[in-house]
Structures are given as C-alpha cells and as structure tokens.
Amino acid sequence: MKYMTAKYFFYSGLLMLLSAAGNASASVRDTISLDRGWQFHRGDVSDVNMLKNLQANDEVVNLPHDFLIGQDWVAPDASERPDNSDAGSNVRSRLSSRGFKEMGIGWYRYELTPKAEWKGKRILLDFQGIMLVGDVYLNGKRIGGTDYGYLGFDVDVSKLLKFGEVNEIAVKADTRNPNNSRWFTGAGLYRDVNLIVTDKDLFFPRHPLFIRTVNNQEVKIRANIFNQQKKVKAPGTFIPVEVRILDAEGHVVAQQKTDVDFNAKWRDREYELPALKIENAKLWSCDTPYLYTAEVTLYDNEGKVADQIREPFGVRTIEMNPQHGLLVNGKKVLLQGFANHHTLGALGAAAYPRAIEKRLKMMKEFGFNHVRTSHNPYSEDFLRLCDRLGILVVDELYDKWLAQYAGGRVDWESLWQKDIPEWVKRDRNHPSVVLWSLGNELQQYSNLPFNDWGVTAYELQKQLLHRYDDTRLTTVAMHPRYRNLDTDSIPADLAVATEVNSYN
C-alpha cells in the first residue's frame, strides 16, 4: 500500500472515531470502537517510538486482524516426515503444531486525540484478546499487557492521556515459539478493541453483574459497584440503584429501585440486589432461545445517573445428575455437537461475528446443539451468538496445566488465579453456557508438585470458580491412557474428584 493511500485510510479511521466519540458524549457510559485504522508493522522493532517513522511502508488494517494467516506456508522437509509405524505420530516439523506458519512478532499503532469532555472521566482501553501474548504502550511507555491471549483485559489511562495532543497507542503481539500450542492460533489483535468512558467516582467495574434465575420466574442480580465519591464519609450513606428487566421487544416487564448501604471503608464491593419477578416468563432453550435484558442504573449523591450497564440473559434451569444426564428446564437434552478450536478456517483466527454466525447456523441445520470450546475461551461475540441461536456451550479454559500450553511467557501457576475470575465473570450470564471445563488432558505433569494426578490443582481452581459462579458444575477433559491401554492407563484419582466426569 502506498504512503498516501495508507495515510488516507488511517486518518479516515481516526475521524470516524472522533465523530463517534462526539455523538456518544451524552451517554453516561461511552463505549467507542477502536477497530478501524491501525498501522500494522510485521516484525520487531528495537524502540516503540520507531513505529511512527515506519508507517509509510506499513499496512493499515482494521480489527479483528490475524497476521499469522498471511504468513507463507512452510512445508516440512524430508527429515520431518511422519513415522508411519506409529499411527499416533504427527509430522515432526517444528511448525506442524501451529499450522505450518512461521512464528513472529507484529506491532500495531493507533493515534488518538482525546475529546475535551473526557477530562475528569474514567477512561479505559479495553482489549478483548491479543494473540499469543501482548504488551500495550501509550506514548512510548508500557502500561499493560497479557500473558494469556484468549482472555481480555483493560487498562485505565485516565491519568496517562495527554489532552489537546495526539496520543500514540502501540501494541506488541508475539506468537512465541511453535511449541506454545498444538494448533493454529493466529496472531495479533484478533478481537475487538474499545475505549470506555465512565464517571470517575461512581461506576461499575469490569464484568460487574451476576444474573441468576430461580424457578424460571425470579431474577436475582449481584452487582459489583465502585464508589469513591468525596461525600461518602461514613456508614449509612446510600446509593440508589435501579433495575429494569426488558423483554425481547424492549418492554419493561419488571423494575425496582432500591438504596444500597455503602461503607466508606469498602470502596469496591458486591451487592445482592432485591429479587425481581417476571410473570409468565418465556424460557430460554435450544428451540426457543428467548432473551431478556437486565438494565442496572447507578445514581450519585445528587440523584443524577452516574453509570448504567445492560446485560442480556435467559430464563432457564440446568441440572446434571447420574440418572438423566443434562436437564434444561427439566427436560433431558443430549449434547450433540463437536469440540472445535477458535479459528475460522481460511479466514484465520480473527473473530469475525458474521463468519461465526454462519458456522453456528450451519451447525443448527445439521442438527447440532453444542460446542465445546477446545481448549480455550472463545470470543464474547461467539457466546452472544450461541445465546441468540440456542447453542449449548461447554466453556473450557486451558489446554494442559503446563507453561508452554498456557502461553509460554509465564508458568501456568502464575496465570490461573487471575484468569479464572476474568473468564467466569465474563461468561457467567450467558444462558448458552451449561458447564465449566477447567481444561484438557490434565491428570498430572511434572511442574505440579502435589503428586496426586491433578486432584489438588482441580480442587483449588474449582473453589475459586465457584466463588464467582455457584450455579454450574465443573469438569476437566481427562486423557484415559497413553499409547497402550494395557500398560499405560492413567490412575482414576481425578475422575473421582470431578463434579462431572469427561473423557477424550
């Protein structure tokens, strides 16, 4: 792409952002897409500040973007042919596990001029995923990043942005070495990036709502609220919170406004809001995936709206027992589907909602009703579409409990305590999710010191998971054997411990 063409599209994307920001300024919570107009540089740079000088020869891309799918194919040489004497042997190429594509590094750069009305606000950069590991820079300084590309994160830039100036956002995406995964992962900013603007003192933090339905009519909502209003000095201060339940046509079917007691010592805490009842609720199922929306509004000390968040949900019950298996709304349902990776074939790993929707609709036409997210969390768009189309999901977190399968930059032991809360809080309100899977083929590996075939590691993770969702059961996908069933079978300790037994 020539320089003038690249610059035209780059600044067109920037103008679209500023226009969107201006139109959204009246909202109490602005969520602005930053998906259009990123400079992309293939390869590493010694200094992040060099990127601006390289833009004349770089591409301008829109997100989601997978830079690995565009790499050349690398065929295995004669020494890398499979061992035909072993039916389970793969091609021994150094790249076979990642789709015969060269691993590498890609840099993304974006120019942002903050609007004047954002001053005094809380401003977040929200990344829904950077594959495989990523680092985020603002005006040349590292401000955040991820060691697990299948989950998102946000960075508070309220005090870092320079108003009245062009700010440079840069993102480094690193695929690491080929052994960091056993399939084609894609690379780069393969999911959406947003800018979120809220009130700075009273707001909902990340993934703040936990919505449960009881007896197919009662709706319970637990809300995480952050309050640092200066007038809050002692217990007995109340925060007005309003909840409205909207049906699929946008009509209010239940609502309630209540005051929650706030202690100044607890700036960040969860509140169990009073339950609401939906008369003659329409149930969510594979055949009738009916969705309601919970709208929760916060009011400040002066009675003005401080923040508002909307979350779709479905009214349904799920149960698993040895007698009947899975019951949805009291009816037995067989999981008929497949385990699949997050990529989209020739399109690569970029999470295009339209492509995901097409695949799910084809599944429904074939009579399928289920997807296992092998072996990592899919995009939020995927789950929204499963909710809308009536596809049941076994939501899986990891492949192996090993460093190289967890991302390659840090050990798995350093990941799970922050990954599980992000994963569960992100996905727990989706009616399509019926079972949590903590991972794939997990019995025991040398980096785990417990020597009990994965039981202690599972119990620790299960305990943390149920802190954030006690409405669903947990499982792991166990590997029943190695090469020879007669001599290499694995002890069944983990099968006894898991809430639901699952085998590959």
Give the location of each predicted region.
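Substrate-binding/catalytic cleft of secreted carbohydrate-active enzymes
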Residues: 360, 370-504
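Surface beta-strand/loop "capping" patches
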Residues: 200-230
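Bacterial Sec-dependent N-terminal signal peptides
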Residues: 1-28
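N-terminal carbohydrate-binding accessory modules
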Residues: 29, 45, 202-212, 295-363, ...
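Accessory beta-strand-rich segments of carbohydrate-active enzymes
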Residues: 41-45, 98-206, 228, 246, ...
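Short glycine/proline/serine/threonine-rich loop/turn segments at secondary-structure transition edges
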Residues: 118-122, 161-166, 232-236, 266-268, ...
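Extended carbohydrate-recognition surfaces in non-catalytic/accessory domains of CAZymes
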Residues: 26-126, 181-189
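Beta-strand-rich binding/interaction modules
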Residues: 138, 218-261, 269
